[in-house]
Amino acid sequence: MDSNISDWHARFRDAEAALNGVVLGQARTIRLLLISALCRGHVLLAGDVGTGKTTLLRAMARALGGPYGRVEGTVDLLPTDLIYSTHIAEDGRPRIEPGPVLEQGEDMAVFFFNEINRARPQVHALLLRLMAERSLSAFRREYRFPHLQVFADRNQIERDETFELPAAARDRFLMEIAVDAPAAPEDRVALAFEPRFHDTTALIAEVGQGILPYRGLNGLAAGVQSGTHASPALRRYVFDLCEALRNPASAGLALEGADAARLIRGGVSPRGMQHLVRAARACAWLEGREAVLPQDVRAVLAPVMAHRIFLSPAYEPRREALVPALIDAAFATIPVPAA
């Protein structure tokens, strides 16, 4: 068993190095994607146009290996388009072909929804079931996708012909990760001037196919969750952080320009806390530890929790500034347990 765990650690190190080699300046996002794979959780990337979201998700899908489905979000996309398509065959008869969800079979490893905010709410509803249950009903039978991980991205710039994801759909994503352009000038220069980064298909092919064998991840994830421990003090720390995000005024949090007592419309759910714990355990395992430390919780709290915090309507227009400030205030206020 120990040798098997050692092999998995080596695979994750290789995958992280390969992904960082083809997607520059996104080390934090790559680590979070690996944590999500280890948790078997779905991921939504949000960012500006041209920041590498699609390239990163395609590279991650290649690292996982296995069948891979993809759909482009458009305003005229229908739920049935995910399941099947129809056309007139050469013999003049109508034919039904599997859509992007079914064409790869039940062994599908990754389903990638590009520009998810361009799809209508009816499509989001179908995706919600696929994410929540990893199953789908079609053609009088039930299809099950035990290895499925859903990746999606959305463009934060364009607002025309877009539809905001409902809270229920966003809550099904383990993480919502903000992707910005690389901060280091040398990375931006390399992306602009090195031809290697101009051919996206060839670049992604540099990532070894199936570095992280997807069929083994369910068993590994279960072992990580059962074998990575959290002390009573750490458990209390997680609880206090989540309570502070639910009721900042009671926790003594202060935010400039906001009334803490009126800030929150809906806070962290029990499922959100479960996801936080799962991600923190995966983070600890990737660091080679058998126990969760406060830094593991802090490393994953924002991407796991930010999209699960619902502000009062008066404060929602300032969400991008207030939610990070709220999380920082919780970190500053809630005492960190001793190691």
Swiss-Prot record:
Gene3D superfamilies reported in the protein's UniProt record: Magnesium chelatase subunit I, C-Terminal domain, P-loop containing nucleotide triphosphate hydrolases
Localization annotation: Cytoplasm
Superkingdom classification of source: Bacteria
Pfam families: AAA_3 (PF07726), AAA_lid_2 (PF17863)
Cellular component annotations (GO), alphabetically ordered: cytoplasm
Disulfide bonds: none
GO biological process, alphabetically ordered: methanol metabolic process
Key words, A-Z: ATP-binding, Cytoplasm, Methanol utilization, Nucleotide-binding
Coiled-coil stretches noted in the UniProt entry, renumbered to this chain: none
Annotated binding of ATP, by residue: G47, D48, V49, G50, T51, G52, K53, T54
A single GO molecular function term of this UniProt record: ATP hydrolysis activity
Principal location listed in the UniProt entry: cytoplasm
CDD domains associated with the record: AAA (cd00009)
InterPro entries tied to this protein: AAA+_ATPase (IPR003593), ATPase_AAA-3 (IPR011703), CbbQ/NirQ/NorQ/GpvN (IPR050764), ChlI/MoxR_AAA_lid (IPR041628), ClpA/B (IPR001270), P-loop_NTPase (IPR027417)
Function: May be involved in the regulation of formation of active methanol dehydrogenase.
Similarity comment: Belongs to the MoxR family.
Protein's recorded name: Protein MoxR
Organism: Paracoccus denitrificans
